[in-house]
Amino acid sequence: MYLPVGRIVAGGLIFLLFASRAAAIDLIIDDEQSLRDAASTTTFAMMTYYHGNETGQIPGAFPSKWWEGSALFLALLHYWHFTGDTTYNNELRVGLEWQSGKNGDYMPSNYSSYLGNDDQMFWGLAAMTAAELKFGDGVFNTQIKRWDTTACNGGMRWQIWPYQSGYTLKNSISNGGLFQLAARLARYTNEPIYATWANKIWNWSLSSPLLNSSTWNVADSTNMGDNCATQGNTQWSYNYGTYMMGAAYMYSYTNGSAQWLTAVDGLMNKLFEEFFPSSNGGIFEEVTCEPSEQCNNNEVLFKGLVSTWLSFTALLVPSTYDKILPKLQTSAVAAAKSCTGHNNNTCGVRWYQSQYDGWIGMEEQISATDLFVANMIRFTGNSTGPVTATTGGNSTSNPTAGENDTSTASIPVSAITTGDRAGAGILTVLFTAGWFGLMGFTVLGG
């Protein structure tokens, strides 16, 4: 969020909380300890916004933006895994457990009435990541029950309930996120059912206006009102990132299939072309909203998520490593220079400016943390890649988790109007939540 109007007071509070920190992040990109220090600084700042570990508060809860909790916990998981710092692991464990809900499907009753498929998915990805990184299943099962064939020959709607603006849209983050989840479950469990679903979602996406395997354009959404004949082609980095990440997992699952290597390369190159523009020195930019300074909190998180997915892609598909790491490094150096706000390492949004730009918030700190941690792959290598159930993972799949969920909304509704879309705003950010539930959420009991 941009500071000058609504966040000045918040900025003052954050200043008081960690004003003793250094006024700048002096990042030496080739130095492992320097990267650790940078990540530690931004993680500390990020956690000043988290109150779920305080008396009377709900662990893992962000009442006005529930899905963003999954982004914070994903950042904490990666931070712990790549740096070895366990400072926040208790908050991480308790928060993930608390928000999983009574069915282990990340649809807690406090929020289930307004969740989107993408919201739930992001929490699932957090749980999946916990399993893959050996930290300590119901989302997948609930989501595939919502595979909708009433229009467009399949696909996931953006929203779950008919009264939600967005119910008649099918979008890339919901479908690409479920694809990613299925691919990761296939690799982790080696169970064919997940690979079958990954291929099904991928092929449907290719048959729709969302994903083009000739140009590798990824559109944001398509409308059921015209049977998905047209697209909303607003460009967001996380739409590319989620399909790329899923393709990388399928590449690993299939032991190097040429089909999936082509997909990874195509999506990665298009991502670089669109969001790492040479006019900005090849620094990561959310091009739809940053130039106009109109990014909302969701959109501020996209670059952090994609930075993480790029780092995992580099580990899963080794031929991409030498292309991905320089992009991450260049962006990290610039981002560190943006973390000079308010004399307390407050990070900005427009990293390409290489100076603080006046933005302040939890989301800015999460994205910077994700980027710094992503650069740790240079020093940790393949030894820190995601494990499977047979290579060190201790989570077990629960094929019936989430079966009690009844949120398969099939009530006919009228098409969404242009005004409805404007009110809905940008598609809700994160695609990763849904996967964790299906893993039986073994992080709960070890």
Language-model features: locations:
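Asp-box/WD-like beta-propeller blade repeats and closely related beta-sheet repeat scaffolds
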Residues: V139-L169
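Membrane-interfacial loop- and helix-cap regions that link adjacent transmembrane helices
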Residues: T222-D226, G232, Q259, S278-P291
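Active-site cradle of extracellular carbohydrate-active enzymes
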Residues: I173-T189, I193-M250, V264, M268-F272
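Cleavable N-terminal signal peptides of Sec/SRP-targeted secreted and luminal proteins
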Residues: V5-A24
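Long alpha-helical scaffolds in large eukaryotic adaptor/regulatory proteins
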Residues: L76, T83, A127, K134, ...
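An active-site-proximal structural segment forming one wall of the substrate-binding cleft
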Residues: Q99-K102, G136-A151, Y194-S208, V264
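CBM-like carbohydrate-recognition segments
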Residues: I25-A75, Y79-F122, A130-L133, Y167-K170, ...
